[in-house]
């Protein structure tokens, strides 16, 4: 029988999980449209994935920090504090990501070559990556705004906004990739331009919803010492985990890209299929983070135990295993995926062991340490 803790958890988890599922299915439609143009266009679009995720690593870390802080204040009395955290984080994200995006733009071609791009499709990759950088910036700002909604458990609202934005993305991409009527066919550049407009829509829609909920009330956008005192310890720990995992994924993807455009295109399609499960289950991780954060604010050890979630990242192991299977045994793309399977098994084992150690310490004691 489902108890009240389970119902609260599922109310947050299911919309977040289905949002991830809808988003990856729509993204798959996107990849299918690009795929009709050939293997080189798939490789050109996919080679930008890791630079994009490196940029999002910073905004996601900040957004997760915002969610954890806001979830502890997730009631009407805490709305003013949540609003202040959101607005100051928006300023930090706009400035930090703005500088990073400028650096990426200035050295974009070198970055793509570093990621494993070849002269066969570098021009296509540049056509896609320049507008895709703009879309990534809009996504980063949206993540900060939606972090507040997530902190309040409003995953259904996030789902509706993101799915609407991605439907717009699919429609615009179809028009701009293939061309309809007076609109010329733009190929991979059209896919990126469609994403720019879709991400801008999601940003504006999210901001409008939060404004209607009163989160843009009178408070300063300028970060102060108190803000940094709250945010930096959380941001630093999350960024270290996110950054370590991203470094491992960059090396992993670079090895796959080094196999050539066609194997890399196949690898990218397979990764997209795997992301169907990954994006779905991530919704449950978000719900665990939110309910655990809310329970910390209430001092409820039991709720934290029900909502406990851990993500233990193994950074060095995957590239080492990938290099061994790829170069040592000469297994090619099969070796890349064998390394991925082993890595995920080890990560799951480590995460379970880590959670058992936390449980042995006692949740109430952990909450007291956090306080």
What are these regions (language model features)?
Residues 135-138, 146, 150, 155-203:
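Helix-loop-helix hairpin linking two adjacent transmembrane segments in secondary transporters
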Residues 1-16, 70-137, 183-239, 292-300, ...:
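Short alpha-helical transmembrane segments in multi-pass integral membrane proteins
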Residues 54-57, 169-173, 203-207, 276-279, ...:
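Hydrophobic transmembrane alpha-helices of multi-pass small-molecule transporters
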Residues 16, 20, 31-32, 49, ...:
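Transmembrane alpha-helix boundary and packing residues in multipass membrane permease domains
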Residues 25-43, 112-119, 175-186, 243-276, ...:
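Helix-terminus/linker motif at the lipid-water interface of multi-pass membrane proteins
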Residues 42-102, 139-158, 257, 266-310:
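Small-residue-rich hydrophobic transmembrane alpha-helices
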Residues 11-30, 131, 135, 165, ...:
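Transmembrane helical elements of multi-pass membrane transporters/channels
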Residues 49-52, 96, 161-169, 194-202, ...:
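Transmembrane alpha-helical core residues of multi-pass small-molecule transporters
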């Amino acid at each position: 029988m489902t108890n009240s803790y389970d119902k609260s958890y599922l109310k947050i988890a299911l919309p977040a999980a289905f949002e991830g599922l809808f988003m990856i299915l729509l993204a798959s439609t996107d990849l299918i449209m690009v795929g009709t143009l050939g293997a080189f266009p798939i490789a050109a679009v996919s080679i930008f994935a890791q630079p994009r995720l490196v940029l999002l690593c910073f905004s996601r870390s900040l957004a997760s920090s915002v969610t954890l802080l806001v979830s502890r204040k997730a009631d009407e009395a805490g709305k003013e504090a949540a609003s202040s955290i959101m607005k100051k984080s928006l300023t930090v994200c706009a400035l930090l990501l703005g500088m990073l995006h400028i650096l990426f733009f200035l050295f974009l071609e070198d970055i793509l070559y570093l990621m494993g791009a070849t002269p066969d499709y570098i021009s296509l990759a540049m056509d896609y990556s320049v507008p895709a950088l703009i879309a990534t910036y809009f996504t980063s700002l949206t993540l900060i705004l939606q972090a507040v909604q997530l902190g309040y458990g409003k995953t259904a609202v996030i789902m509706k906004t993101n799915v609407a934005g991605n439907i717009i993305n699919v429609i615009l991409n179809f028009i701009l990739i293939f061309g309809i009527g007076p609109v010329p066919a733009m190929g991979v550049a059209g896919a990126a331009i469609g994403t720019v407009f879709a991400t801008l829509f999601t940003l504006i829609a999210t901001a409008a919803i939060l404004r209607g909920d009163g989160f843009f009330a009178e408070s300063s956008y300028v970060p102060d010492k108190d803000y940094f005192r709250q945010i930096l310890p959380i941001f630093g720990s999350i960024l270290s985990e996110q950054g370590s995992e991203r470094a491992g994924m960059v090396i992993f993807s670079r090895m796959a890209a080094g196999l050539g455009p066609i194997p890399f295109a196949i690898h990218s399609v397979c990764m997209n299929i795997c992301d169907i499960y990954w994006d779905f289950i991530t919704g449950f991780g978000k719900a665990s983070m939110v309910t655990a954060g809310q329970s910390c604010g209430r001092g409820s050890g039991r709720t934290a135990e029900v909502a406990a979630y851990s993500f233990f990242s193994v950074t060095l192991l995957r590239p080492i295993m990938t290099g061994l299977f790829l170069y040592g045994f000469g297994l090619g793309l099969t070796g890349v995926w064998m390394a991925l399977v082993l890595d995920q098994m080890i990560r799951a084992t480590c995460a379970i062991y880590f959670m058992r150690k936390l449980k042995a310490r006692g949740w109430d004691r952990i909450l007291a340490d956090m306080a």
